[in-house]
């Protein structure tokens, strides 16, 4: 599917969307963590599928996660009215929080957010850490 998502009309959604929540996978800059790895780990935690609606790998490819009509599993207490977007990375080589987004990820994320804002103009874009009650560094950069 790849970046065709950015130009296709797959955004029909009947859920009210108030937030677009940006996440990182909390993996080291040197660690490969594919969308399939994320999906496997989320299912192992008891989720029905990957918790995010979109996942952006280091090469800048955006992968579809949960369908937008489905409630995500990415931000406890905020899932019902939000869309979850995750990028691969978020930790430096020592495992400390760090903005490890590649230029390709930054470009893809910007395009995806522009597209989502066209469909959900009232939605606020926030980092996971910006949500009240969240004690994480995710997405490891200022949104």
PLM region spans:
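Basic/polar, cationic surfaces and motifs that engage anionic cell-wall
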Residues: 1-21, 25, 58-62, 67-68, ...
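N-terminal carbohydrate-binding/catalytic regions of secreted carbohydrate-active enzymes
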Residues: 29-41, 66
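Structured segments of extracytoplasmic/periplasmic soluble domains
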Residues: 37-45, 112-119
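Glycine-rich phosphate/pyrophosphate-binding beta-alpha loops
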Residues: 71-73
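Short, charge-rich binding segments
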Residues: 75-77
């Amino acid at each position: 599917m790849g970046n065709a998502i950015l130009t296709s009309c797959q955004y029909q959604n009947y859920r009210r969307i108030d937030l677009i929540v940006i996440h990182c996978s909390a993996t080291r800059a040197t660690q490969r963590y594919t969308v399939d790895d994320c999906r496997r780990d989320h299912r192992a935690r008891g989720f029905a599928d990957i918790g995010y609606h979109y996942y952006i790998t280091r090469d800048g490819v955006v992968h579809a996660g949960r369908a937008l009509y489905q409630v995500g599993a990415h931000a406890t207490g905020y899932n019902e009215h939000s869309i979850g977007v995750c990028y691969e990375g978020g930790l430096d080589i020592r495992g400390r929080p760090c903005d490890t987004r590649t230029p390709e990820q930054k470009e893809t994320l910007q395009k995806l957010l522009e597209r989502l804002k066209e469909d959900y103009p009232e939605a606020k874009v926030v980092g996971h850490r910006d949500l009240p009650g969240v004690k994480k560094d995710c997405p490891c950069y200022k949104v």
